[in-house]
Amino acid sequence: EAQAAGLQEETPVLDVHLLGSVICSQAVWPHMKAAGFGRILMTTSTSGIYGNFGQANYGAAKAGLIGLMNVLQIEGAKNDIRVNALCPSAATRMTEGLMPESVLALLTPESVTPAALFLVSDDAPRRTILSACAGGYARVVIQETAGVFLPEGERTPEAIAARFDEICDLSTAMHCEEPGGPGMR
């Protein structure tokens, strides 16, 4: 019973924050495709990118939007449909009590709006996650290290453990636009 009740609490959050974007994207997609032009902006969250205590459902939905953005951008590229994500920091009911009032006062919608407008403009990038916080703007990227290749017969948990520092060496990290680890490069 507890699991069923928990799922009932989780579902509306997923419906609003993930499925709402899926449904809206499906509604506009054929029109954008026919026009040979379109812009879609997903609203992700630091809870989806970095995690946050007590927000598993919300964080999962917001992380799901990044996957949705990536797939829709690939599918829409040939029709100049550009899909991006905005990661705003704003003073909301969810952030009340988490930060001092002086900080919340800086987290205005007006400081986020320019980023949103850029991401849907004619000059919008493609497949970009843009963070907007109190007048600060930064690109958020998913990176992959160069990693290591283990030949067949050496692919064991122990071999991975022995080379884990090398696998995780961020000095070799690169921004990836498509999948492909060390074995595929």
Pin down the residues of each PLM region.
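Active-site helix of classical SDR
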Residues: S25, A61
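Flexible, glycine/small-residue catalytic loop immediately N-terminal to the helix bearing the conserved Tyr-Lys
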Residues: E1, M32-K33, Y50-G54, G76-A77
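C-terminal helical subdomain
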Residues: A85, V103-R185
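Residue(s) in the substrate-gating loop at a strand-loop-helix junction
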Residues: S45
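Active-site-adjacent segment of SDR/Rossmann-fold oxidoreductases
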Residues: Y50, I66, V71-I81, D122-A124
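A short helix-coil junction within the Rossmann-fold of NAD(P)-dependent oxidoreductases
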Residues: A27-G36, D122
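Catalytic Tyr-X3-Lys loop
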Residues: Q3-V22, F37, L41, L65
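Conserved mid-core segment of classical short-chain dehydrogenase/reductases
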Residues: E1-T11, G54-N57, E96, P100, ...
